[in-house]
């Protein structure tokens, strides 16, 4: 059972501010306008962009995408911000994942969606970040046309295989770390919601970071944040306790995600907790007050145990950076082994087949 040393005394929970109606963000022509952000049926434009470029041409595609070109196959995901649909281009036959967000939602969520669009606009050139091909605003909804990752997420993978072996985990970690190096060092972005369900996989064995709805852009790579957003299970202790945090909070979340994939359960839960899980506050208190989880040394290699410990440190400065972790012995151990993650995920049933 989860044991807690003391009560969690610090937790920043903010009272929602008075919200502005969606109509206050719309121009006379129906364009959604929020600061430097403009979005309509034709696409996205950031007025702060030096080139003033409009996202009317679909990225990395030799054909254009409009709302009329896409037909819905089925809903493949739901969340607080909207739904994700599997859609097909009527004329080309290519599949995409389209996130549709109705804008009659809380203003805080609306701001997160705007943030996601801005980050996707800048980050789609990284091969380890899910590509956002196009986005538009129409009939009160934002739509993001995203790369379709046909094997779902790491959460879908472990749902079928229960645990992932070290060689495959090394391949997963390297790809996620390359994505984090790009986000942290080039885009100055803290993802803030790294977890198995936000690490997507395709049949080729490519792993990509998705869902930037709660990401935070920083002015420099030395910046810090002090807001409480993201999925609490994978939050670092400093974020839960309301302290400032930086890129190292993503490293904690990565370590938690990788360890979960290895042992087949959330690291702070023992086997008996699966049937009677702790409450929200008990789990938060355990993450802040208890020693961090470790990989069992009798089940895993010293390299893997060391990698997990390099990520899951209570003291943020003690965590390795994404760049340092790329040269960790666990990553290097399998680099010349020609490990093909596609072999593992290729044997699995695509999640779209069992989602209703």
UniProtKB/Swiss-Prot annotation:
Residues 70-331 form the Protein kinase domain. ATP binds at residues 76-84, 99. The modification Phosphothreonine is found at residue 231. Disruption phenotype: Plants exhibit a dwarf phenotype with fewer flowers, large cells with multiple nuclei in various organs and large malformed pollen grains. Defects in the formation of the cell plate. RNAi MKK6 displays fewer lateral roots. CDD domains: PKc_MAPKK_plant_like. Activated through serine and threonine phosphorylation. It holds the Pfam family Pkinase. It catalyses: L-seryl-[protein] + ATP = O-phospho-L-seryl-[protein] + ADP + H(+); L-threonyl-[protein] + ATP = O-phospho-L-threonyl-[protein] + ADP + H(+); L-tyrosyl-[protein] + ATP = O-phospho-L-tyrosyl-[protein] + ADP + H(+). GO terms for biological process: defense response to oomycetes; lateral root formation; male meiosis cytokinesis. PROSITE patterns: PROTEIN_KINASE_ATP, PROTEIN_KINASE_DOM, PROTEIN_KINASE_ST. Expressed in roots, stems and flower buds. Higher levels in shoot apices and flowers. Phosphorylation at Ser-221 and Thr-227 by MAP kinase kinase kinases positively regulates kinase activity. The active site is at 193 (proton acceptor). GO terms for molecular function: ATP binding; MAP kinase kinase activity; mitogen-activated protein kinase binding; mitogen-activated protein kinase kinase kinase binding; protein serine kinase activity; protein serine/threonine kinase activity; protein tyrosine kinase activity. Belongs to the protein kinase superfamily. STE Ser/Thr protein kinase family. MAP kinase kinase subfamily. The ANPs-MKK6-MPK4 module is involved in the regulation of plant cytokinesis during meiosis and mitosis. MKK6-MPK13 module positively regulates lateral root formation. Phosphorylates and activates MPK4. Activates MPK5 and MPK13 in vitro. This is Mitogen-activated protein kinase kinase 6. It comes from Arabidopsis thaliana.
